[in-house]
């Protein structure tokens, strides 16, 4: 069975030569980040008379016995300088936030675990528990025994590297993309500003994902990360957000930037956002998304399903297809299941619910919530009060986001930080 060792076992401990004489003190271990699930350890930084030197792993022995010996003939006396892609395990990882990609949480690296795998030493895991923290702080042998259940496999870990000089690394976008945008937003909100910037920079490689993450951020963090962007860049980001979310954010931007950003939006998005901004933010009009899936009364089931497939409407609004008459008034609504079960040639209206309820844009959100609850709906149509024309939908997720208090995820134990 592979023996796992604590990084702290070696830190600030003596390193001896082959004669057993002390030659210096271990400052850190150096690992190389790349495509390896477990980064290989390439050497150690040792301090001799105030000078930090690098010793490659091929000249180091004794690790299995919990000590470090120099097994070379002579030391390279040049000062240590890290190379691109190298991490110092203690300086860059220990006591810092890391991303647990499996759980979508931040963890604190209270201990780094290393092991010899097929003749090579590698970083195999992280212990985020309190026991290793107290062991390091108090300098005791408390809990030297490895608690395998507490160790997080380094293969599921992504470190922050923005603080690492000349690392030339960034958080891999493809790894973050496996998380839900809400999980990524939670990570950003719980991280430091610098760590959050690193995450935003990584997801920025996928503009749609970046917009999805921004929509999930709280207002404080949205404004924080827009601050350093030009008005044009801010408008590009908002143009990819849902119109209702873009309108909410524009409402919060400093007044001296608001108009410029609004006028920089594409014409179609700008028109929708301006319309939404005409409503009070706490009303159905302010909450609604003007984009929804609709078909005329003459549409068949096949045409309704084609409308869903070709639509750019977000997932929440995509769950319901509305049938509108020639005046744009809803006369039926169907979720996807009845449409999928029906024959392609059937009229969409024949499988739709025709007893519909609705709200008007001036209704406050509590009245909207009661209506949605009473009729057990997840998507509620908003009709123009004067003509009865359908102008948007309120979805249950947007409504909950407004009704629940700020920081509700932390209040209900859904924090993105593991302790």
Regions found by a protein language model. Give the residues of each.
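Short, surface-exposed loop/turn motifs at beta-strand boundaries within globular domains
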Residues: 8, 22, 37-39, 180-181
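Short beta-strand segments
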Residues: 22-28, 332
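N-terminal beta-strand/beta-hairpin edge segment
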Residues: 11-17, 27-53
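Hydrophobic packing positions in regular secondary-structure scaffolds
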Residues: 46-50, 56-100, 106-419
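Terminal domain-initiation and capping elements
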Residues: 2-11
């Amino acid at each position: 069975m592979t023996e796992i060792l604590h990084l702290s076992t070696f830190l600030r401990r003596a390193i001896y030569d082959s004669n057993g004489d002390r030659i210096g003190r271990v400052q850190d271990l150096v690992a190389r980040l790349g495509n390896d699930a477990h980064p290989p350890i390439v050497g150690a930084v040792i301090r001799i008379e105030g000078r930090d030197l690098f010793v490659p792993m091929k000249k180091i022995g004794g690790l299995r016995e919990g000590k470090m010996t120099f097994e070379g003939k002579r030391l390279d006396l040049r000062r240590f300088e890290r190379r691109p892609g190298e991490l110092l395990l203690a300086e860059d990882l220990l006591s810092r936030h890391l991303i647990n990609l499996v759980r979508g949480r931040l963890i604190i690296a209270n201990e780094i675990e290393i092991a010899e795998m097929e003749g090579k030493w590698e970083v195999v895991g992280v212990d985020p528990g309190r026991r290793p923290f107290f062991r390091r702080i108090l300098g005791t042998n408390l809990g030297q025994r490895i608690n395998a259940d507490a160790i997080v496999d380094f293969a599921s870990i992504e470190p922050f590297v923005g603080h690492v000089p000349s690392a030339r690394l960034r958080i891999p976008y493809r790894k973050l993309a496996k998380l839900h945008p809400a999980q990524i937003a939670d990570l950003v909100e719980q991280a430091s500003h610098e760590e959050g910037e690193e995450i935003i920079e990584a997801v920025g490689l996928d503009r749609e994902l970046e917009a999805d993450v921004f929509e999930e951020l709280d207002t404080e963090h949205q404004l924080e990360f827009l601050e350093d962007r030009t008005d044009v860049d801010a408008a590009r980001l908002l143009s990819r957000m849902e119109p209702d979310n873009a309108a909410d954010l524009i409402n919060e931007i400093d007044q001296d930037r608001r108009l410029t950003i609004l006028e920089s939006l594409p014409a179609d998005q700008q028109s929708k956002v301006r319309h939404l901004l005409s409503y009070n933010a706490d009303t159905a009009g302010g909450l609604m998304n003007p984009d929804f899936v609709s078909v005329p009364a003459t549409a068949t089931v096949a045409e309704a399903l084609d409308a869903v497939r070709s639509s750019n409407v977000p997932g929440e609004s995509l769950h319901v297809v509305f049938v509108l008459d020639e005046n744009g008034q809803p006369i039926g609504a169907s979720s996807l299941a009845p449409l999928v079960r029906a024959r392609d040639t059937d009229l969409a209206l024949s499988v739709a619910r025709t007893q519909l309820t609705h709200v008007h844009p001036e209704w406050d959100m509590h009245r909207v919530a009661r209506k949605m609850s009473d009729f057990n709906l997840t998507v509620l149509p908003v009709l123009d009060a004067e003509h009865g024309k359908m102008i948007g939908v309120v979805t249950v997720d947007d409504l909950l986001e407004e009704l629940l208090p700020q920081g509700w995820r932390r209040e209900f134990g859904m924090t993105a930080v593991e302790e």
